[in-house]
């Protein structure tokens, strides 16, 4: 819980930082939506972390992609969008509806959709015609493979409560990582290769 509160405080501080040329990407609204989505995921916790230890799994979150300096500005926006889209797809399923409190789940899906809508508008402003060539880029494929592993895991575990709890914790990691990328974009004004 302390980690989540620290993360929330960091998000609040970032939301007041300079947006530079990426004001569209990193608006206060987008950061507030990200913070609310993390808070909702935290509230969705129904099981003790110790009760599901046998189901824990390393899904291979591509952290080097969001923490390293491998991505250009347009790639970073595509990775952020894909992370949010895949997260939305994961929670907007019949299996997910059976596993979670529907009120919290609906709020989470609405929040993710709001972030997607905002990023989609921003991506259109920056990307223009590059969008089609970036659709097949390695970072996007990596994100898709990461989420495919999560889907396979849920199927393998029969969509059990512990499997969903493991995925909920992983989604908190994934959305935190995407927020880290947003913060890096804010600090560097969009140039991920600057110090």
UniProtKB/Swiss-Prot annotation:
Keywords: Antiviral defense, Cytokine, Disulfide bond, Hormone, Pregnancy, Secreted, Signal. Disulfide bonds join 24-122, 52-162. One of its GO terms (cellular component) is extracellular space. Constitutively and exclusively expressed in the mononuclear cells of the extraembryonic trophectoderm. The keyword NADP does not apply. SMART domains: IFabd (SM00076). PROSITE patterns: INTERFERON_A_B_D. It holds the Pfam family Interferon. Residues 1-23 form the signal peptide. It is found in: Secreted. One of its GO terms (molecular function) is hormone activity. InterPro entries: 4_helix_cytokine-like_core (IPR009079), Interferon_alpha/beta/delta (IPR000471). IFN-tau genes are intronless. They evolved from IFN-omega genes in the ruminantia suborder and have continued to duplicate independently in different lineages of the ruminantia. They code for proteins very similar in sequence but with different biological potency and pattern of expression. Belongs to the alpha/beta interferon family. IFN-alphaII subfamily. Paracrine hormone primarily responsible for maternal recognition of pregnancy. Interacts with endometrial receptors, probably type I interferon receptors, and blocks estrogen receptor expression, preventing the estrogen-induced increase in oxytocin receptor expression in the endometrium. This results in the suppression of the pulsatile endometrial release of the luteolytic hormone prostaglandin F2-alpha, hindering the regression of the corpus luteum (luteolysis) and therefore a return to ovarian cyclicity. This is Interferon tau.
